[in-house]
């Protein structure tokens, strides 16, 4: 293959940066993650990184938007054609599957921390974007569940508890998870 045909396009690199940023921000938070670390994970120089994104905040916003989009994708794919309780059960099972993808859930948690910190510093750009994305996710869930704000609130609260337990490091076999119901129809092993 010619060397030029192996090169990634700027859009492919941008996608790589977003994926790498989600991992790094999930692990170290907004303030604890350097653009150098993200560039290294992607295999590009920092100057090239800044050709793709104007700065760290733009990278974080793109990663946060992707995180919310991927959460909806999980809900949407698992509950396609369903509404009401059937949709809630399907989406809940699918979200429990994300417990194994700690970076996805921790990116959500880091987003909330970053919003709080940016507002404390009187720089609300991250907060505005996060609230818009979260509201869109909430509304999509509300509609899929049948339109009730109460049902959507209960569903989202369930998800936040999952995020909290993951952030606290409870292993999946800990008794704290028992209230979430069986993930399969199989009987537990003796």
What are these regions (language model features)?
Residues 1-4:
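Short, intrinsically disordered or compositionally biased N-terminal tails of bacterial proteins
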Residues 11, 15, 19, 65, ...:
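Generic detection of well-ordered alpha-helical segments
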Residues 13-16, 20-58, 62:
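Helix-turn-helix
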Residues 61-62, 72, 146:
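Short, Lys/Arg-enriched C-terminal cap helix and immediately downstream tail that follows
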Residues 62-65, 75-103:
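Hydrophobic alpha-helical connector segments
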Residues 119-190:
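Hydrophobic/aromatic-rich alpha-helical bundle segments in the mid-to-C-terminal region
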């Amino acid at each position: 293959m010619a060397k030029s045909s192996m090169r990634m396009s700027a859009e492919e690199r941008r996608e790589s940066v977003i994926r790498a940023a989600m991992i790094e921000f999930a692990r170290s938070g907004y303030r604890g993650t350097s653009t150098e670390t993200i560039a290294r994970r992607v295999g590009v120089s920092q100057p090239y990184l800044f050709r793709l994104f104007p700065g760290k905040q733009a990278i974080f916003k793109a990663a946060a938007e992707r995180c919310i989009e991927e959460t909806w994708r999980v809900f949407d794919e698992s509950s396609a054609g369903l509404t009401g309780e059937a949709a809630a059960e399907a989406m809940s099972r699918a979200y429990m599957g994300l417990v194994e993808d700690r970076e996805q859930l921790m990116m959500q948690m880091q987003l909330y921390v970053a919003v709080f910190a940016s507002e404390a510093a009187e720089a609300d750009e991250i907060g505005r974007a996060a609230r818009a994305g979260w509201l869109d996710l909430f509304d999509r869930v509300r509609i899929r569940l049948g339109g009730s704000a109460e049902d959507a609130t209960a569903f989202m609260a369930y998800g936040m508890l999952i995020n909290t337990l993951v952030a606290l490091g409870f292993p999946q076999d800990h008794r704290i998870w028992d209230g979430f119901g069986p993930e399969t129809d199989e009987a537990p092993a003796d």
